[in-house]
Design a protein with these regions (language model features):
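Hydrophobic, aromatic-enriched alpha-helical segments typical of multi-pass transmembrane helices
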Residues: 8-51, 55-136
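Short, intrinsically disordered terminal tails adjacent to the first/last structured region
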Residues: 1-7
Length: 136
């Protein structure tokens, strides 16, 4: 949040936005926790040989699909919040856009569990994450 009188001075982020950011953060932290538990509970799953996307296949695949979708919601939510927090400047424009692309990609991975579309969405997610690091 920018101070209009002095653009270099930081204005405290409103408490409401900090809570919203915390909820989005918790949603993204739950993602690896859920896939770790799901991978441990899935017979025959080897995390050293198989990707977490393979957990979305088979009879219990709905758990990982839901995990991808919930993480997508969290990332989209955080993109919205970051847009409000980073008022003005290049970061305020591009970082939330790249995060939103990542969130939509997570939805795509949840819906399309098989290649080639699944891989296309994975490439979109990874690129959005990498470009987001350069924008910051």
């Amino acid at each position: 949040v920018r101070n209009k009188a002095d653009p270099l001075a930081a204005t405290p982020v409103p408490q409401k936005l900090l809570w919203w950011l915390t909820f989005g953060f918790v949603g993204t932290v739950l993602f690896p926790i859920i896939y770790t538990i799901e991978g441990a509970a899935r017979p025959g799953y080897d995390p050293l040989r198989q990707t977490i996307s393979s957990l979305s296949l088979g009879p219990g695949g709905w758990v990982q699909q839901l995990n991808f979708a919930l993480c997508g919601v969290s990332v989209l939510w955080m993109a919205f919040i970051w847009r409000k927090i980073l008022a003005g400047g290049v970061c305020a424009t591009w970082y939330p856009i790249l995060r939103a692309i990542e969130g939509v990609g997570l939805f795509g991975v949840a819906i399309f569990t098989r290649d080639p579309v699944h891989t296309v969405f994975l490439v979109v997610i990874v690129n959005a994450m990498c470009f987001g690091l350069f924008v910051i």
